[in-house]
Amino acid sequence: MKTGHFEIVTMLLATMILVDIFQVKAEVLDMADNAFDDEYLKCTDRMEIKYVPQLLKEEKASHQQLDTVWENAKAKWAARKTQIFLPMNFKDNHGIALMAYISEAQEQTPFYHLFSEAVKMAGQSREDYIYGFQFKAFHFYLTRALQLLRKPCEASSKTVVYRTSQGTSFTFGGLNQARFGHFTLAYSAKPQAANDQLTVLSIYTCLGVDIENFLDKESERITLIPLNEVFQVSQEGAGNNLILQSINKTCSHYECAFLGGLKTENCIENLEYFQPIYVYNPGEKNQKLEDHSEKNWKLEDHGEKNQKLEDHGVKILEPTQIPGMKIPEPFPLPEDKSQGNINNPTPGPVPVPGPKSHPSASSGKLLLPQFGMVIILISVSAINLFVAL
């Protein structure tokens, strides 16, 4: 039986696609400038309270795979959360996102690969993030989970963890720094290089989080490293292996992109360190917790105190409208606000008051005149009465 030209072309294309899928591709280690690296430092509460819960509902409804992964992790988290120490501000959605990513990453599922590739490319522009990134809520909750579980560098960087990859390449020169560009698991057991193409990364992380307590069974030390932690890269001996030493900083091209922040030309260092307070009391179900969480700011002097954000390349984007979703107006950036003053962020847009949300409504504060105005009104009334008499 003769095979037609069309059938031959189809078979060749199918073969090429299969080869591309199963081929182990070399990983380039660099600053991952196309990754979506927002840390939401200036808009954490606004995002968490006002926008992300609705985003999660919409993204789960439109992405069946995400919905399945989330619901499976939700059940695991419910059974696990009473057995581990947690910071006071650590919420269920943080734990669910963490459990979901750990499970999918360990099993190397299609969802893990889909999410990782999306994160690595969604930062090309704000439009790519807004229109093309399907995991905005998942990314937010996972980022916040790692921030809240973070410990001081002195405690986390003493022990080396390892990661292997097929033919990782790094171009030495300049600062010799790199970021992974996606959330990365590393292990305490050093693997043996099976061939010359396998690269072993020895990683000393400051901002990575030990996650073995989140697993169902005891295991070796496993560390989840944030995508934007900056490492100093050096070569180990004469082979392909590399040493990655954290500089105890992250850097980001984005800050509150969902609220209008544009991509900066340079990767801006984030100098905020979160000092969580941990709680553990599984026996008391209705335990009431007071929020004693605090942030210890380690701010460095980068020039004048009132240095403008424009000096760092921060730009403001006009609001972009997505069909079926409300995107808030971009946050204004005052000229006298310094880059380091992230403890007093610029107020966001005020929503239109709804029922019982305005101060004059029955559920709010009464709008009373000031005391001085009351005195003036009484005086005027008395004068008018005296004149009339």
Curated annotation (Swiss-Prot):
Subcellular location: Cell membrane
Recorded topology in the membrane: Lipid-anchor; GPI-anchor
Region of interest: 3 X 10 AA tandem repeats of [GS]-E-K-N-[QW]-K-L-E-D-H: 283-312
One Pfam family named in its UniProt record: ART
InterPro entries, per database record: ADP-ribosyltransferase_ARG (IPR050999), ART (IPR000768)
Compositionally biased tracts (Pro residues): 346-356
GO cellular component: extracellular exosome; extracellular region; plasma membrane; side of membrane
Glycan-linked positions: 248, 346
TR mART core domain mapped to chain residues: 64-251
Prodomain residues: 363-389
Residue span of region Disordered: 325-362
Covalent lipid sites (GPI-anchor amidated serine): 362
Annotated S-S bridges: 43-256
Gene Ontology MF terms: NAD+ poly-ADP-ribosyltransferase activity; NAD+-protein-arginine ADP-ribosyltransferase activity; nucleotidyltransferase activity
Residue sites binding NAD(+) per the record: 101, 163
Tissue specificity remark: Testis specific.
Catalytic reactions of this protein: L-arginyl-[protein] + NAD(+) = N(omega)-(ADP-D-ribosyl)-L-arginyl-[protein] + nicotinamide + H(+)
Entry keyword set: Cell membrane, Disulfide bond, Glycoprotein, Glycosyltransferase, GPI-anchor, Lipoprotein, Membrane, NAD, NADP, Nucleotidyltransferase, Repeat, Signal, Transferase
Effect of residue 334 to S: Found in patients with non-obstructive azoospermia; uncertain significance
Mod. after translation: O-glycosylated with core 1 or possibly core 8 glycans.
Record-linked Gene3D superfamilies: Toxin ADP-ribosyltransferase, Chain A, domain 1
First-level EC class: transferase
Family: Belongs to the Arg-specific ADP-ribosyltransferase family.
Record protein name field: Ecto-ADP-ribosyltransferase 3
Species: Homo sapiens
Gene label: ART3
